[in-house]
């Protein structure tokens, strides 16, 4: 059995892989996370265990760790595993560099959940394009990188109540807070275009 704490994105991917390989998969999620993501994981054969909102993302991680320890399950550890940013170094960053070959690339802007994307992509882009600026974004009410206390926010998959171990903060040149309502309204406007 594979177990992982997830806001849904990695959980959906793990549910697909586990279904294809015939492995049982258990996802732990905070009860306030997307019902749609839960349904999709369940449709792929996953068992979804909800943790109390008051326990935040730390609670879902602790629940996954407890289940792995108690049952001898494999814990994927997306917030800690070096495989996470390594994947983005080898694929996401390589794709960006291919797409921008012969063109300027001044900024890479990314939010963070596990920190894998901004770390892996940022590290490669800094070497390939030394003048690039890596911009991290996080909900304004949960601006941990900005030195603020964490508060619940509405941007799914972004910014748990801890700074992930896998994240290389040194690669980030600037952090920009994003308002929940503005983020929602902007995504809806872009979807309509």
Which role fits each region the language model picked out?
Residues 1-193:
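PLP-dependent amino-acid enzyme catalytic core
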């Amino acid at each position: 059995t594979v177990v992982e704490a997830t806001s849904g994105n990695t959980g959906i991917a793990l549910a697909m892989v586990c279904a294809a390989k015939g492995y049982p998969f258990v996802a732990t999620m905070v009860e306030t996370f997307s019902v749609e993501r839960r349904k999709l994981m369940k449709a792929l054969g996953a068992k979804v265990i909800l943790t109390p909102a008051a326990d935040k993302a730390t609670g879902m991680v602790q629940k996954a760790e407890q289940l792995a320890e108690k049952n001898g399950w494999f814990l994927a550890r997306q917030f800690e595993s070096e495989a996470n940013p390594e994947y983005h170094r080898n694929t996401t960053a390589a794709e960006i560099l291919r797409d921008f070959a012969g063109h300027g690339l001044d900024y890479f802007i990314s939010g963070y959940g596990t920190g894998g994307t901004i770390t892996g992509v940022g590290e490669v882009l800094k070497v390939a394009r030394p003048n690039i600026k890596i911009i991290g974004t996080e909900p304004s009410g949960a601006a941990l990188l900005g030195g603020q206390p964490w508060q619940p926010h509405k941007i799914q998959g972004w910014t748990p109540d801890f700074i992930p171990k896998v994240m290389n903060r040194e690669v980030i040149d600037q952090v920009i807070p994003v308002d929940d309502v503005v983020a929602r309204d902007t995504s809806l406007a872009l979807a309509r275009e």
